[in-house]
């Protein structure tokens, strides 16, 4: 069974790899990715793309700058970070004398870098 699924996968890959009109992001490529994902071939799948605290902070800063602007991203440094089993939670920090207003909170999926939650408290 294992060999037949690997053979099928390789045949599928060769079929589309030899196709000169293949377009990146095409339906065929997406179908192939889903097929490999269903086979649970860990060798070919990406796990924990966001592996480090530093990377999580960099991603959070990109999202915050895009959504709230440069000023908010800089004002709420240094960022506080919490590691959960499947995600990173990054929060902005305010100095004690800056009691008015809230901070951003963003949760980023470790596996793929997607934003799971994103808000700014008041």
Curated annotation (Swiss-Prot):
N-terminal signal peptide: 1-17
Q: Which InterPro entries match?
A: NTF2_fold_dom (IPR028921)
Q: Which UniProt keywords apply?
A: Signal
Q: What does its record list under induction?
A: Repressed by H-NS, induced by LeuO. Part of the rhsD-ybbC operon.
UniProt xrefs under Pfam families: Imm-NTF2-2
- PROSITE patterns attached to this UniProt entry: PROKAR_LIPOPROTEIN
Q: Which domain of life is it from?
A: Bacteria
> What name has this protein been given in UniProt?
Uncharacterized protein YbbC
Recorded name of the encoding gene: ybbC
């Amino acid at each position: 069974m294992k060999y037949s699924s690997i053979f099928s996968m390789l045949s599928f890959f060769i079929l589309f790899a030899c196709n000169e009109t293949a377009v990146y992001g095409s339906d065929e490529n997406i179908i192939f990715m889903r097929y490999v994902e269903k086979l649970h071939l860990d060798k070919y799948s990406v796990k924990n793309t966001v592996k480090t605290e530093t990377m999580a902070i960099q991603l959070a800063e990109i999202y915050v700058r895009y959504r709230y602007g440069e000023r908010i991203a800089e004002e709420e440094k240094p960022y506080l970070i919490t590691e959960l089993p499947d995600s990173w939670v990054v929060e902005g920090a305010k100095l004690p004398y800056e009691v008015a207003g809230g901070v951003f909170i963003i949760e980023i999926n470790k596996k793929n870098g997607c934003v799971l939650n994103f808000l700014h408290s008041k």
